[in-house]
């Protein structure tokens, strides 16, 4: 024979049941004691007509304006009297002294000297020893009056000498020039050892002179050294060889 023991409920379940029961009891209590307020009966509405002039606020009374006090005019300053102008002092210029008249120079009287009478010389009697033949000049006098013969050096004869070309820069600037050149002539008649001795103006005509002299030709078989020529450039575009 077995006995049935009552089952034990877990404590979380009991706690939940207690909380719910408390909430239900509270709701019941508040619903019983709640007072229901009825709305008040409607009352009639009264309307009063008011004019807009009554609603305007009263204007503030402005105080009367204060009288404007005009400032007293300032006294005008008394004019300062100007000092009397002094009369300009006139300085009298001294009168120029009259220049003394130059005294006339005394004219020296030229005393005329008495002319001396020149008596003609009496003719001298011819001496028998004088020679009436004309005097011949001595040999020393003749040698002094005669000019010695100057020997003209014979150099190479030029066959063709082309004129140098006028530089375009000098022609544009309208500049004339002069170049002095020293050179040698070989036995074949060619020019070599060209040296510029002077050039006016410098660095203007030298290159054209050297280029032209390379084409010069002289007579073969007659060499020469230290020959000097002057080349003058004119504004008309020509060159003169001296």
Curated annotation (Swiss-Prot):
Predominant localisation class? membrane
Q: Mind listing the GO biological process terms from this record?
A: bacteriocin transport; protein transport; siderophore transport; transmembrane transport
The major lineage groups are: Bacteria, Pseudomonadati, Pseudomonadota, Gammaproteobacteria, Enterobacterales
Write the protein's name. Answer: Protein TonB
- This protein's UniProt keywords: Bacteriocin transport, Cell inner membrane, Cell membrane, Membrane, Protein transport, Repeat, Signal-anchor, Transmembrane, Transmembrane helix, Transport
Transmembrane region(s) = 1-32
Answer whether the UniProt record assigns the keyword Cell inner membrane to this protein. yes
Q: How does it sit in the membrane?
A: Single-pass membrane protein
The ranges of region (7 X 2 AA approximate tandem repeats of K-P) come to: 93-106
**Biased segments, Basic and acidic residues type:** 108-119
Report the family membership.
Belongs to the TonB family.
Compositional bias per record (Low complexity), positions renumbered to this chain:
132-153
Give its localization: Cell inner membrane
**Pfam families recorded for this chain?**
TonB_C, TonB_N
What does this gene product do?
Answer: Interacts with outer membrane receptor proteins that carry out high-affinity binding and energy dependent uptake into the periplasmic space of specific substrates such as cobalamin, and various iron compounds (such as iron dicitrate, enterochelin, aerobactin, etc.). In the absence of TonB these receptors bind their substrates but do not carry out active transport. TonB also interacts with some colicins and is involved in the energy-dependent, irreversible steps of bacteriophages phi 80 and T1 infection.
């Amino acid at each position: 024979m077995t006995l049935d023991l009552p089952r034990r409920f877990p404590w979380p379940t009991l706690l939940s049941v207690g909380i719910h029961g408390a909430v239900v009891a509270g709701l019941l209590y508040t619903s019983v004691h709640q007072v229901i307020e009825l709305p008040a009966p409607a009352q009639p509405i009264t309307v009063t007509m008011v004019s807009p002039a009554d609603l305007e606020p009263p204007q503030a009374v402005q105080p009367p304006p204060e009288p404007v006090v005009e400032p007293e005019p300032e006294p005008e300053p008394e004019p300062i009297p100007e000092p009397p102008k002094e009369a300009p002092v006139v300085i009298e210029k001294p009168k120029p002294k009259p220049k003394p008249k130059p005294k006339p120079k005394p004219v020296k009287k030229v005393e005329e000297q008495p002319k001396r009478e020149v008596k003609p010389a009496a003719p001298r009697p011819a001496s028998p020893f004088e020679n009436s033949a004309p005097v011949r000049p001595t040999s020393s006098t003749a040698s002094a009056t005669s000019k010695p013969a100057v020997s003209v050096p014979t150099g190479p004869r030029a066959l063709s000498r082309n004129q140098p070309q006028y530089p375009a820069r000098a022609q544009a600037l309208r500049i004339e020039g002069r170049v002095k050149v020293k050179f040698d002539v070989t036995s074949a008649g060619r020019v070599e050892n060209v040296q510029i001795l002077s050039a006016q103006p410098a660095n203007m005509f030298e290159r054209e002179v050297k280029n032209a002299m390379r084409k010069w030709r002289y007579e073969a078989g007659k060499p020469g050294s230290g020959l000097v020529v002057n080349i003058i450039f004119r504004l008309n575009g020509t060159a003169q060889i001296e």
